[in-house]
Every structure is written in C-alpha cells, then in structure tokens.
Curated annotation (Swiss-Prot):
It comes from the Eukaryota. One of its GO terms (biological process) is response to molecule of bacterial origin. This is Cytosolic calcium-binding protein 2. It comes from Arabidopsis thaliana. Residues 31-122 are annotated as: Disordered. Predominantly expressed in roots (e.g. in endodermis in the stele) and stems, to a lower extent in shoots, flowers and siliques, and, at low levels, in leaves. Induction: Levels follow a circadian cycle with higher levels during the night and lower levels in light phases. Accumulates in darkness within 24 hours, but repressed by light and the product of photosynthesis (e.g. sucrose). Induced by sucrose depletion, but activated by glucose, mannitol or sorbitol. Triggered by gibberellic acid (GA) and salt stresses (e.g. NaCl and KCl). Suppressed by a high concentration of calcium Ca(2+) and of other metal ions, including magnesium, cadmium, manganese, nickel and zinc. Up-regulated by cold treatment (e.g. transfert from 22 to 4 degrees Celsius). It is found in: Cytoplasm, Cytosol.
Length: 138
C-alpha cells in the first residue's frame, strides 16, 4: 500500500466581518393542473413506442450468449483451418523433395562409382595388354 501525506490548511480567523444575507421572496404562482395530465399521457406512450421494453428470462439471455459464443468459435475454427491448410501444404512438399533428393543422390553416386571402377579396370586391362604386347615384341 502507498502512504499518502496530506497537508491540512486552516483558514485564518477574521474578526468583525459581517456577512450579508440574501433575502429571497417566494412568489406563489397558481396554474391550472387539469390540462397537463392529458398532454403528458401521449408523451409517455410515444416513448414506449420508440423504445419498447422487452422482458427476458435469464435462460433466454444465457441461450443468446451461448449462440454468440458458438458463432465466434466457429469463425475462429474456420480461420484456424484455413491457416493450417496453407502452412501444412508447403511443409509436406518440402519434406518429400528432401526425401527424394536423399534417396536419389546416393544411388547416382554409387552408379558413378561403379562406372568409374569399370572404366579403371578396363584401362588397367588395356594398359596391361599393351605392356604384354611390348614385351612380346622385344
């Protein structure tokens, strides 16, 4: 809690001061009361017609509030579904592409290695044959 300091100011007492008093004269005005109720009755009915008052039960109010809540929940769920569809689709496609790349790359590398090994063997065999031919010629 906060503490609040308050300074009290006391007015200085003034001596021998006369305070003038105002005199008010009340005037009595007599009016005819018989015409006023007739005019005020239509005014009251006009107010009722402009803004009718409807009595409601607590159950009705609760039901209306629940309906509004359900409508807002449905709207938010629809928005969530739309955003989920948008975000899920690209992620799934990227994962599939990565999986394909991973599976294709080792297969291609292995095939290239196999072809290189075969080519090396062929060159070695050819070189060995050339050496054998040269030795035979000598």
């Amino acid at each position: 809690m906060a503490t609040v300091e308050v300074e009290q100011v006391t007015p200085v007492a003034v001596e021998n001061v006369e305070v003038p008093t105002k005199t008010v004269e009340e005037t009595v005005v007599e009016t005819e009361v018989t015409q006023q109720p007739e005019e005020s009755v239509p005014a009251v009915t006009e107010q009722k017609s402009e803004a009718p008052i409807v009595e409601t039960n607590e159950e009705v109010v609760v039901e209306e509030a629940e309906k509004k809540d359900e409508e807002t929940e449905k709207k938010t769920e629809e928005k969530d579904e739309k955003t989920e569809v948008i975000t899920e689709t690209p992620v799934v496609e990227e994962e599939e592409k990565k999986a394909e790349e991973v599976t294709e790359t080792p297969a291609v590398v292995e095939e290239e290695k196999k072809t290189e090994v075969v080519e090396e063997k062929q060159t070695e065999v050819a070189a060995a044959e050339e050496v054998a031919v040269e030795k035979a010629e000598e």
